[in-house]
Each structure stands twice: as C-alpha cells, then as structure tokens.
C-alpha cells in the first residue's frame, strides 16, 4: 500500500525553522500549510480542515497547550502531534516527539499514528478483496 498523502497544518514560532522543517513533510509527499504563531494557526483552523496538526517546538509552551484544544474544537477527528516532550501530558495531544529529534524520526512517528486521513485508503484496500 502506498503512503497516505496527508493535509498537514504545521505551526512554529520561528519562521526559519518553519520553512526548513516544512520541506521535509512536503518531500515525504504531504500537503503542508505553514503558519507562524498561534493566531495564524487559529485562523487556518477556521478556514480549512486538516488530517494532522503539527505544533513545533519553537511555539511557546502556552501555545502548545492552547492549540490542541482549538484543533479538537474545529474538528475532533484531526490528529495533533507536538514536537516537544511536554505534549505527552496533554489530553488532546495524540502523539509527541522529543525536542530536537531528527525529521526522519518525526516522519516515522507520523506513519505510526492512527490518522483519520489515512483510514480511507485502508478501507478502500479492504473493499477490493
């Protein structure tokens, strides 16, 4: 089965980090909307639906805490990945990685998540039997 192409909202507090790391998600075949800061992330959530929201380590701790609530309020099926260990304690965070892990590790973590955007491919594969 081919890898699922996900629609990702990726937020960081630092524009340089955002641009550099978003390239890795795009190179893996995902469609990425990049946002810098909490307000931009909230606006994007109001305008579009996403399979996965990734909250980067350069967002403030307060933003990484507040945004998962906003994601689930916008769409309870959207998965949330926090690129910081403090995400493990949050009830609305589906997965987290340690700060500073390689992008390959982050991409591997995404592949192990049960993301709603991946499910239609699995269902379609099962229907063809």
Residue ranges and their predicted role:
Residues 81-129:
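Output/docking surface of receiver
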Residues 54-73:
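Conserved phosphotransfer microenvironments
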Residues 5-15, 21-25, 53:
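Conserved acidic segment of CheY-like receiver
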Residues 34-52:
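Acidic, metal-coordinating helix/loop segments flanking the phosphotransfer/catalytic sites
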Residues 1-6, 75:
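Short, flexible coil/linker segments at domain boundaries that flank nucleotide/cofactor-interacting
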Residues 46-48, 71-78, 86:
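Conserved phosphotransfer cores of two-component systems
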Residues 11-15, 55-58, 83-85, 99:
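Structural motif
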Residues 28-32:
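A generic structural motif
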